[in-house]
Amino acid sequence: MAGVFCFALILLGSSCSGIVVPFKSNKKIDLASGYSAMSGQDFEDHLASLKLPFMKSPGVKIYGLNEATQKYIESLISDILGNNEIFFKRLKKGTVTIIDSEAPLHFSLPKGEIFLSRGLITKYLKNESMLVCVLSYELVRSEKMLYPRQTIIPIGYLSLEKMIGLSRLSLDEKMEVHKWSHHLTIRSGFDGEYYLSWLQAQNRNTADFILQVGDVNQINREESLFKAFLIKSTNEEQVIHRKESSKSFYTFINRIREVT
């Protein structure tokens, strides 16, 4: 009997990329109060540690940034964090990993670990402010630990689908993240109007974004609710926005396009 049990465990390990264990919590999310939905240093460390097994997984291709593009993307993150220190109480820095994939994807892990796909950057991020919108979105999630309440035990590797699964949030959660990300984008000196453009791009190209958004109906609802939010927002801070993208932005985009 013991031998049969051991064989079953071996078979399970060879056929799965990870075991998912639910992480239960009865606490409610309140972004405005600074509450972390997935509190606990151990859980934060656990999720952050998934970066390495994911990057080593079969089929996952990572595009290494050169020094110039690395400094550029780090400077954008520094702008977001530095101009919003009241909001970012935990995060002091962030890193961006580029996935060499044609699918438009973005997701993150705790401790400011952000992942963007080559397809997202080259096809859809047409303006520097839009890039900042995406970075702000993932930084908010990382700061507030807004990830599904489950523990993932990687067995050898971690698939892209499982990593994308960590980006799944309820409609209410996503709307709170959108509102904060829009605010932080403006506070960082970028054009907040591109946040709506970003949601519209996903809604108009659902076939491309299906892996990212999951529920097509939800992204449609997100756009509608965000428009209503913008109409009601009458006390937006007066900040001088960068209307034009920097030369460094176009250098960054062209560099990513060079991947063969």
Describe the function of each predicted region:
Residues 121-129, 138-155, 189:
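Catalytic Zn2+-binding segment of zinc metalloproteases
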Residues 3-13:
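Bacterial N-terminal signal peptides
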Residues 59, 82, 97-101, 117-118:
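N-terminal post-signal-peptidase region of extra-cytosolic proteins
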Residues 135-144, 176, 180:
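Active-site His/Glu-centered metal-binding helix of metallohydrolases
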Residues 115-116, 130-138:
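Short alpha-helical catalytic segment bearing the HExxH-like zincin motif
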Residues 16-71, 83-91, 122, 172-260:
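C-terminal capping/extension segments of zinc metalloprotease domains
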Residues 145, 151-172:
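Substrate-binding clefts and substrate-entry loops adjacent to catalytic sites
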Residues 97-112:
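Catalytic zinc-binding patch centered on the HExxH motif and its immediate surroundings
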